[in-house]
Amino acid sequence: MHYEKKLSIELKEKLISVNRVSKTVKGGRIFSFTALTVVGNNQGKVGFGYGKAREVPSAIQKAMEKARKNMIIIPLFKNTIQHSVTGLHTGSFIFMKPASEGTGIIAGGAMRSVLEVAGIQNILAKIYGSTNPINVVRATLNGLKKIRSPEMISKKRGKIITII
């Protein structure tokens, strides 16, 4: 229990979007809210959550809890990614490319938030197709999941790192 509290303190949380949605029933409409959040530790660990509730704070709380449970680890190299990568989810297609020191995060919309909480400081990124925040976040995480460090590749191939 103590470990979870310590873990949650070092995590950086970011709210991407809050949306009001409605369900039409016989007596009229029932309104509820959805929240999309990302959580990361600024050292290559990132996750996203999507929560829905009748009130905004409850939706955000649910989204944050889901984000903490769905975290992935990204192998970073000098505050950027190891190699160029693409990600796809439904209509959103993203392209990310490592950048030199001092470039900053050149990315738009929801992708910028994901990269910031992941701890990536220098990157060039572009969204093609749909810019729907949910699809962009999922496409970004799909792309980040594809990143492999030289150590991972050498281990998989059974070769030494210098050959790769």
UniProtKB/Swiss-Prot annotation:
<feature type="domain" description="S5 DRBM">
    <location>
        <begin position="11"/>
        <end position="74"/>
    </location>
</feature>
<keyword id="KW-0699">rRNA-binding</keyword>
<dbReference type="InterPro" id="IPR005324">
    <property type="entry name" value="Ribosomal_uS5_C"/>
</dbReference>
<dbReference type="InterPro" id="IPR013810">
    <property type="entry name" value="Ribosomal_uS5_N"/>
</dbReference>
<keyword id="KW-0687">Ribonucleoprotein</keyword>
<comment type="function">
    <text>With S4 and S12 plays an important role in translational accuracy.</text>
</comment>
<dbReference type="GO" id="GO:0003735">
    <property type="term" value="F:structural constituent of ribosome"/>
</dbReference>
<keyword id="KW-0689">Ribosomal protein</keyword>
<dbReference type="InterPro" id="IPR018192">
    <property type="entry name" value="Ribosomal_uS5_N_CS"/>
</dbReference>
<dbReference type="InterPro" id="IPR020568">
    <property type="entry name" value="Ribosomal_Su5_D2-typ_SF"/>
</dbReference>
<dbReference type="InterPro" id="IPR000851">
    <property type="entry name" value="Ribosomal_uS5"/>
</dbReference>
<dbReference type="InterPro" id="IPR014721">
    <property type="entry name" value="Ribsml_uS5_D2-typ_fold_subgr"/>
</dbReference>
<dbReference type="Pfam" id="PF03719">
    <property type="entry name" value="Ribosomal_S5_C"/>
</dbReference>
<protein>
    <recommendedName>
        <fullName>Small ribosomal subunit protein uS5</fullName>
    </recommendedName>
</protein>
<comment type="similarity">
    <text>Belongs to the universal ribosomal protein uS5 family.</text>
</comment>
<comment type="function">
    <text>Located at the back of the 30S subunit body where it stabilizes the conformation of the head with respect to the body.</text>
</comment>
<dbReference type="GO" id="GO:0015935">
    <property type="term" value="C:small ribosomal subunit"/>
</dbReference>
<comment type="subunit">
    <text>Part of the 30S ribosomal subunit. Contacts proteins S4 and S8.</text>
</comment>
<dbReference type="InterPro" id="IPR005712">
    <property type="entry name" value="Ribosomal_uS5_bac-type"/>
</dbReference>
<keyword id="KW-0694">RNA-binding</keyword>
<dbReference type="Pfam" id="PF00333">
    <property type="entry name" value="Ribosomal_S5"/>
</dbReference>
<dbReference type="GO" id="GO:0019843">
    <property type="term" value="F:rRNA binding"/>
</dbReference>
<dbReference type="GO" id="GO:0006412">
    <property type="term" value="P:translation"/>
</dbReference>
